[in-house]
Amino acid sequence: TNELAQARESLARRLQGVDPTDFAALRKAYDAYAENDPLPEMSTMSEIDLGGVSCLGLLPKGCSGDHVILWAHGGGFAMGSSRSHKGLASQVAAAAKVAAIVPDYRLAPEHQHPAALEDIVITYHAILGEGVQPNRIILAGDSAGGGLAVAAAMKLKEQGAAMPAGMILLSPWVDLANRGWSHTSKAQRDPFLTTAVLDTRAKQYGGEANANLSILDADLRGLPPAFIQT
């Protein structure tokens, strides 16, 4: 669509001339690309600390905050932040009439697996510690963040912790080995990503054993129900 083409061109302009190994510059450009995303009317938007993890708290106007979406942002495990995803998270939160919390989890390649996963799980437990009931929490995420949301639910199951009410997963990255047929059949149609880029990000996040982290191969029984949009 024209909108996708414009978005791709805008991001390409932001990244033009940026050294692909300079992650500080890449992240700055990525955040700047999304900084003007429209925001719904907010009661509060504040930086908060939950269990030692820096987060952005988003409370749409008219919401009490006793229901929470915990949003794991996308960005290939190496980019993205609460700033780049505040527009997306706040739009979903406003539509659902709940609060949203977006953690700034540790990023690869400086911090490989399981750092990001640990930060999401820590944030979840901290939200419980604030008195929010588990049946009023949704784990959510887009792209790599969608994979992290599922991985966090798996870790909570392993811990025997109280499970969230459900999950919202937008194009979740669940196969770090990138084995799907669409990597070939739709190679020229994805507006942003290539398989080569995904392979690089997977190795930066999980090292040479990154394929073993693929949620696609995991036992997902006992996880909360999920809404998946691709």
What is the predicted function of each stretch?
Residues 154-208:
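Hydrolase active-site cap/lid region
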Residues 81-82, 88, 103-136:
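Catalytic nucleophile-loop/oxyanion-hole region of alpha/beta-hydrolase
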Residues 66-76:
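Short beta-strand element of the alpha/beta-hydrolase
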Residues 141, 145, 149:
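Gly/Ala-rich beta-loop-alpha elbow adjacent to hydrolase catalytic centers
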Residues 60-68, 221-223:
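Proline/glycine-enriched tight loop/beta-turn segments at coil->beta junctions
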Residues 1-61:
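A glycine/proline-hinged amphipathic helix-loop "lid/cap" segment
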Residues 206-230:
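Serine-hydrolase catalytic core
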Residues 139-141, 170, 229:
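Short beta-strand immediately N-terminal to the catalytic nucleophile in serine-hydrolase-like folds
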